[in-house]
């Protein structure tokens, strides 16, 4: 993604002039903000934009976008986010067995999924309930390996307290077969496992509908 943004920026620099160049470059920053990609390459390109267009009317919006990008990329991983080593895991069960004897709320997501990110705004009550009732919050990302760093930063940026696993090749297809349909997986997808490691809800309620989700978690705990 970084190379794509850089190529686009320098293509605009060489191919366009004046207001057209200025607007095209500014859109790169605004699209990054709007789509929450937070491409780190844009941080250095911001300096280039300022040199080329120091009086640009786009500057307030570009500065805001760059500020959000920088905040994301400078996010530290807090102690309450855990990334267990699952490199040897062959199945989903190998992962859930790490939390034997506990109810598990699994959130299947990806960094590129807008609805997944939007749902994170509603996780407060779920986090409080999980802490009080020893429920494991397991965030299962279907991101590709090349997005590993972004995946970790995004988990921290959104304050996703809990366990974080990125799908491994060994059980990638199993995730799609188990929770998808005809080879496609719609995310976000929420799954609840009981204390015996059995799936109780293959399509649990979103944290946005907390009262209903709480009932499902309580049922899984019986």
Predicted feature descriptions by range:
Residues 19-20, 99-100, 130-133, 157-158, ...:
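A structural signal for short secondary-structure junctions
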Residues 73, 128-172, 180-181:
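Conserved segment of the thioredoxin-like fold in thiol-based oxidoreductases
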Residues 103-104, 188:
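Alpha/beta-hydrolase fold active-site loops
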């Amino acid at each position: 993604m970084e190379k794509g943004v850089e190529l686009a920026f320098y293509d605009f620099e060489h191919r366009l002039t004046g207001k057209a160049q200025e607007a095209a470059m500014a859109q790169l920053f605004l699209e990054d903000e709007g789509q929450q990609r937070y491409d780190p390459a844009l941080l250095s390109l911001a300096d280039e934009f300022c040199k080329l267009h120091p009086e640009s009317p786009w500057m307030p919006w570009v500065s805001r976008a760059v500020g959000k990008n920088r905040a994301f990329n400078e996010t530290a991983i807090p102690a309450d986010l855990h990334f267990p080593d699952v490199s040897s895991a062959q199945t989903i069960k190998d992962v859930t067995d790490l939390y034997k004897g506990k109810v598990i709320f699994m959130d299947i997501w990806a960094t590129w999924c807008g609805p997944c990110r939007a749902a994170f705004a509603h996780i407060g009550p779920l986090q409080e309930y999980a802490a009080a009732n020893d429920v494991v919050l397991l965030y299962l990302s279907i991101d590709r390996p090349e997005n590993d760093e972004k995946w970790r930063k995004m988990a921290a940026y959104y304050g996703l307290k809990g366990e974080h696993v990125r799908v491994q090749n060994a059980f990638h297809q199993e995730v799609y077969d188990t929770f998808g349909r005809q080879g496609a997986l719609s995310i976000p997808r929420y799954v609840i496992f009981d204390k015996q490691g059995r799936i109780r809800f293959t399509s649990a309620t979103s944290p946005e509908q907390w009262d209903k989700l709480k009932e499902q978690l309580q049922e899984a705990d019986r």
